[in-house]
């Protein structure tokens, strides 16, 4: 896939890196999660405005890594209730920590909320890499 080829390319530029993360927005979050399932070196993820109402995320059983799911409560493309259903399913899995952030008033495109989105993602990364939210180097469930 294109995502796997992109990851291979990035890893070729940084051969000494011991880990990596994946992030995706909308359909890209589904692609990123597919990649997460196939690549054991991926230690975490950020899924922005995933669309479980459109794309099947049932392959995330079990989800091998902890991560952030962030979305807006005014998203009409990926309704909050559908994203909540995905988060609820992931919360039942052992060995991972799923952090959910719901941005009040934010739509699917985060119009007028892009700075808040960036701040929330940066805060999550800082806290996660400091070991506050989940083990910074989790053991994968494989």
Mark where each language-model region is.
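Catalytic histidine-centered segment of alpha/beta-hydrolase-like enzymes
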Residues: 106-118
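Gly/Ala-rich beta-loop-alpha elbow adjacent to hydrolase catalytic centers
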Residues: 24-32
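Alpha/beta-hydrolase fold nucleophile elbow
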Residues: 14-25
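Alpha/beta-hydrolase active-site loop
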Residues: 1-14
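Acidic catalytic loop of the alpha/beta-hydrolase fold
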Residues: 73-78, 108-109
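Short beta-strand/loop motif that positions the catalytic acidic residue
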Residues: 63, 68-71, 75
């Amino acid at each position: 896939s294109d995502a796997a080829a992109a990851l291979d390319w990035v890893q070729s530029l940084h051969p000494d890196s011991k880990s990596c993360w994946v992030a995706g927005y909308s359909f890209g979050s589904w692609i990123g999660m597919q990649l997460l399932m196939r690549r054991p070196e991926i230690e975490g993820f950020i899924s922005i405005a995933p669309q479980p109402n459109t794309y099947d995320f049932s392959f995330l059983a079990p989800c091998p890594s902890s991560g952030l799911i962030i979305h807006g409560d005014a998203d009409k493309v990926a309704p909050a209730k559908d994203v909540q259903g995905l988060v609820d399913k992931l919360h039942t899995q052992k060995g991972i920590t799923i952090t959910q952030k719901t941005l009040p008033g934010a739509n699917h495109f985060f119009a007028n909320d892009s700075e808040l989105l960036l701040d929330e993602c940066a805060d999550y990364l800082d806290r996660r890499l400091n070991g506050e939210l989940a083990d910074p180097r989790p053991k994968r469930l494989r």
